[in-house]
Amino acid sequence: MNIDLQRFCANENDPREYLRAPWRDGGWVYATNGHLVVRIRDDGAESIPARSSRHPNAAAMFRKHIEDRSCEFMVMPPITEPDKCTHCGGAGFVSAIKCEDCVDGEFTHGDYEYTCKNCCGSAAGPGWADAYEKYPSAQRVPCAHCDFMGYSLNRNGATNIGGALYSTVYLWALSLLPQCRICPGDAAYSCLGTGARETPAALIFDGGQALLMPRIE
């Protein structure tokens, strides 16, 4: 099964550009957006760059939370598809143009700075104005209301598994991986000496592994 890791990467609005695409390291290919990290076996694709000094040491995270941890995996509970983002319709992207009235959602008049009303609340976020796809200068921009996922993270809330809360949107995305199984964070309480809120959920699936940080309400 071909697994698209790009959906687990940071989006184009994230200042950490080195997280916007997968990278390879030690026989694995990694992807992360800072909330979750997924890795699959490296099939030798030349288009994927090697880990740089800016990339996190994801291998150490998997070693700590899967290889050195007494995990008891269970089949991922059924996760109902979350409500799609009302701004992008579930696409994760919207059509927008650079706002001509401001810089990143603000403009200066005299000695004061003001919030731009032209792009305030736009689907693409501050500094972008909504536009039709066929508008001459329209660009395909990550939706600012769902962090490129196509589903609102806040509106869909969290799901309790094993005593810890996890983003329903991220759980659902991970549940689509083949034969996905999960070990909730609280299963590692005794061996790591930390609570469920501090320990990521460990997941395994056919061809790879993942870690998901709990959500604090």
Which sequence ranges carry the predicted segments?
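C-terminal functional regions that serve as terminal interaction/effector modules
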Residues: 26-27, 31-217
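Intrinsically disordered, low-complexity linker/loop segments enriched in Gly/Pro
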Residues: 1-39
